[in-house]
Amino acid sequence: MSSSLHIESIGQGQELVILHGWGVNSSVFTPLHASLSEYRVHYVDLPGFGHSDPIDGDLDDWVDAIINQLPNTAIWIGWSLGGLVATKAALRYPEQVRGLVTIASSPCFMAREDESWPGIPPQVLSQFSTQLQQNIGKTIERFLAIQVMGSATAKEDIKQLKELVLSRPLPKNSALAQGLKMLENIDLRAQLPQIEQPWLRVWGRLDGLVPRRVPPLMPNHQAHFTDLLLPKASHAPFLSHRDEFLTGLTDWLNKF
């Protein structure tokens, strides 16, 4: 089945793919455009978000649809839910994903108390699921507020996020429900050691969705895994600490 995905390709140079998180669209990366102009960057609206058509199925179906519409060899960068998509792409298509960058993204977003795994409390995700059926706009707004919580520039960050997100159509209900289900159910922890590509993991120490206890629990014995912790950032470090984020990202990209 062929579905139309909205992909904005800007710049010239090394191929990068950038994927956004839940409830938003690729316009959240607009502030990065000028700084990444020396790369060929493909800004993707995930299925059912922004200008992209929805795609039935699960995470694998999303990955298959996206990879078919992108260059054969690129470095994939994913923020939050987009990090899950990028990680799965790196695992499924190692020859097409040259490198992996995850931003404020966990391999298992939901807390697993029986395993002492830190994450989003299950009741929070179920509340979002219930609220979706009542008011999409307010649900997304609440989620955006959680993303910037903890940042010293939270007020400015939420204003910027809202302006960017609302520049495109609201996500489809089906896509929001799919995304929540992925955040609730996907657990890639056991597969992480299989990642062969260079992998940069960017964390915000004040992140309310990916707790600071997650990075120390990640596999780190591979020489090609690199962690960048931004001490004053929360869940959207590319907005709140753009210069710091870009310096870390471009330094890492320059090693290719």
Curated annotation (Swiss-Prot):
Protein keywords: Biotin biosynthesis, Cytoplasm, Hydrolase, Serine esterase
Residues at the active site: S80, D207, H235
Record InterPro entries: AB_hydrolase_1, AB_hydrolase_fold, AB_hydrolase_sf, BioH
Chief location of this protein within or outside the cell: cytoplasm
One of the record's GO molecular function terms: pimelyl-[acyl-carrier protein] methyl ester esterase activity
E.C. number(s) listed in UniProt: 3.1.1.85
Keyword match Ligase: no
Catalytic activities: 6-carboxyhexanoyl-[ACP] methyl ester + H2O = 6-carboxyhexanoyl-[ACP] + methanol + H(+)
GO cellular component: cytoplasm; membrane
AB hydrolase-1 domain boundaries: 16-240
UniProt binding sites for substrate: W22, S80, L81, F143, L144, A145, I146, Q147, H235
One Pfam family named in its UniProt record: Abhydrolase_1
Class in the EC hierarchy, top level: hydrolase
Pathway(s) this gene product operates in, as recorded in its UniProt entry: Cofactor biosynthesis; biotin biosynthesis
GO BP terms in the entry: biotin biosynthetic process
Family: Belongs to the AB hydrolase superfamily. Carboxylesterase BioH family.
Function: The physiological role of BioH is to remove the methyl group introduced by BioC when the pimeloyl moiety is complete. It allows to synthesize pimeloyl-ACP via the fatty acid synthetic pathway through the hydrolysis of the ester bonds of pimeloyl-ACP esters.
HAMAP family: Carboxylester
Protein name: Pimeloyl-[acyl-carrier protein] methyl ester esterase
Source organism of the structure: Shewanella woodyi (strain ATCC 51908 / MS32)
